[in-house]
Amino acid sequence: MSIPLAIRAAFWIWFFAALFVGRFLLLQKFPPPAGQGVVLALTAALVLTYRHAAAFRTWVDALDLRAIVLFHVTRFVGFYFVFLYRRGELPYAFAVPGGIGDIIVAALALVVALFSFGEATRLHAIYIWNVIGFIDILLVVFSAVRIALAGGGRELIALTQLPLSLLPTFLVPLIIASHLAIFARLARARAVT
């Protein structure tokens, strides 16, 4: 099996494991902030794999930066956060600031990735977008930790059920790790010039 195929297979296995966790409500079996602990552990695993597994790092670094940025359109999930707040299923302190921040980051990802820029301008735009997106996702995670600890996890129960359980078990670790990979790529590009 080729390295790229093995990496894709690993991601599919991880995705199906995340679906399993959500389907059987496994995050509910642990005290808060277990979901955020899962985010931390999975992000650390991705970062360590990127740092120490040359084949994985080569595969990630071969991806077009615009493709990595476009992955962040998944952050339009922020609209769903706001919708769930309006239905009373997520607290304002998490859903509205986090949702609006994610919507902005997703919209900016489209601009940065799809608009016609010169290479230097694109790299600068990606850097600015990456800083904004990274800060936003960290604020969302820290907000979730604070709310989970203060309320015993009841306010964020929606994050333990599908489809939102895919956030801590799959999507958010990929988002954080992708921001770190973009920072690494941009630093190397800057060092070359």
Regions found by a protein language model. Give the residues of each.
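Membrane-proximal helix-loop-helix units in multi-pass membrane proteins
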Residues: 70-123
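Hydrophobic core of alpha-helical transmembrane segments in multi-pass integral membrane proteins
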Residues: 12-23, 36-52, 110, 134-141
